[in-house]
């Protein structure tokens, strides 16, 4: 099973380079980091949220939405796929707005981060779908399990991965968030 892992992706041009590399290398799993700008905004949300600056948090969430929609418009020209990713963006942004309404705590902060990491991965997934590849975002939450000692349960993880692969034989490439 071929796996490609990518480092920091700063902008749209680097995103295009990663997509081209994935098309050339054709890995079974491509591990992509969150886009650098989204990472910066996640930090800004955490800081403003923990300081109870709700307006700043919501404004930052809106900036994430605008940025993702702009990327979608530039990179995903197929109208059907563009609409699908925009629906995903709006769904994610709505969830995040609801989450930042709650009182700040670490669990909710992790949920916000998970949403944005997933959204970043989904942008790559849809870009590759536009190129004709059957691509799916890898739901890593289904695969990871810790044992009673709070360590990864390797036998469970191996079994889960094999089952996941068997269930998704029609997928060319999985995109995994880093």
Annotate each predicted stretch with a short phrase.
Residues 1-178:
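Nucleotide/pyrophosphate-binding catalytic subdomain
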């Amino acid at each position: 099973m071929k796996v490609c892992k990518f480092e920091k992706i700063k902008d749209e041009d680097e995103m295009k380079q990663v997509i081209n590399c994935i098309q050339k290398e054709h890995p079974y799993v491509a591990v992509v980091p969150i886009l650098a700008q989204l990472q910066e905004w996640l930090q800004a949300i955490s800081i403003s949220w923990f300081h109870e600056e709700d307006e700043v948090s919501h404004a930052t969430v809106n900036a994430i939405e605008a940025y993702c929609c702009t990327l979608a418009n530039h990179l995903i020209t197929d109208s059907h796929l563009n609409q699908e990713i925009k629906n995903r963006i709006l769904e994610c942004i709505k969830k995040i707005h609801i989450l930042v309404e709650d009182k700040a705590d670490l669990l909710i902060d992790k949920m916000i981060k998970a949403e944005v990491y997933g959204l970043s991965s989904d942008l790559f997934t849809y870009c590759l779908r536009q190129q004709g590849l059957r691509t799916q975002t890898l739901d890593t939450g289904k695969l990871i399990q810790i044992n009673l000692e709070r360590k990864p349960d390797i036998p469970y993880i191996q079994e889960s991965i094999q089952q996941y692969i068997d269930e998704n034989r029609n997928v060319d490439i999985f995109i995994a968030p880093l």
